[in-house]
Amino acid sequence: MSDERGYSSADLPLYYEWHGKSAGSQPPLLRVHGGGSTIETNWGLLIPALEESRRLLAVELQGHGRTGTGAGPASFEGSAAGLAALLAELGVGPVDVLGFSNGGQVGLQLAARHPAAVRRLIAASAPFRREGMVDGFWAGLAAATLTDMPRPYFDADVAVSGDPAHAERMFHLDRELMLTGFTDFPDSLIASIAAPTLVVAADRDVVRTEHAVRLASLIENARLLIVPGSHGDYLGELFAAAGDSGPLERTVPFLTAFLDD
């Protein structure tokens, strides 16, 4: 249960929640979910693992969970700008950032375009070029329809938004974001990231291992962590972890060691 929640005052108000305890001089950890997700589906297992030692801020991006769908398409740059504005409005920053999948792409944009907002970045399973996805990913996404959306994600969104049409719009927003909205992030943009960065991927991820290596090589102050597992199970993500907290428990010490360094 969050101890504080609200919406930003932007044209598209972003829903946010606070969890956990202040940890001395440590900044809050902003968590940015992946596609098709809510706070609960992406971070339901991670929050209890961290809330005793750190102040946690979670948001829901355009069209996800309690945040409205908006009138236009989603973009990684736009989401990063919305997060920077939210942090300024809350009077916090620089913060540590953990972004998963699409949220990792937003985190990269946030660190590059709004460097004053980010102290440390964890970019988890985050592609920065289209070629970074495994074989078959793009063809599968292009052919996908709403019926291909895993039912737990659909139901989880409806549970908090109260509207099946919201979950349907979320599916189309995320699909179009990747198919048409995602253009390769320039190497120069990635190389401009000054925040210490931990690049994380799983050995059976949808992001190629060599792509994660390339991402880490472009950021001057970056480390690389390849963990056993699949896309998101190592963060306790609902569909990937399927209730098994083991991969998360094995990964958390690496994340906290990086954040506390």
Model-derived segments and spans:
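Catalytic active-site module of serine/aspartate enzymes centered on a nucleophile-bearing elbow/loop
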Residues: 228-261
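Conserved HGGG/HGGXW glycine-rich cap/lid loop of the alpha/beta-hydrolase fold
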Residues: 11-68
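Short beta-strand/loop motif that positions the catalytic acidic residue
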Residues: 193, 199-201
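Flexible "cap/lid" loop of the alpha/beta hydrolase fold
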Residues: 105-113, 119-153
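Active-site nucleophile elbow and catalytic-triad environment of alpha/beta-hydrolase enzymes
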Residues: 173-189
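Active-site loop/oxyanion-hole signature of alpha/beta-hydrolase fold enzymes
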Residues: 44, 48, 57-98, 241-249
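Conserved alpha/beta-hydrolase "acid-adjacent" motif
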Residues: 206-211
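Conserved alpha/beta-hydrolase "nucleophile elbow" surrounding the catalytic nucleophile
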Residues: 33, 95, 99-104
